[in-house]
Amino acid sequence: MRITYKDIDYVYEILNGSAINKETTELKIILNGEPITLTKEDGKVWIQQAGEVTLEPDFAQALGRSVSLRYRM
């Protein structure tokens, strides 16, 4: 999938797509070749778990929202 953040295009792949439903609180994605894990806190805020690549909090939220819209979470 694609997302544009601050006028830059990114490509990401959802690794656990078949397991996503309305109760999903963790997303595993590959963003430009790097594994990223996002966790949903307080039922609405997506944050990045520790990893080699650090994303801006707003970008992590944008990725989580993008997946949420795609899978109607």
Region annotations inferred by a language model:
Residues 1-73:
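Cysteine-centric segments in proteins
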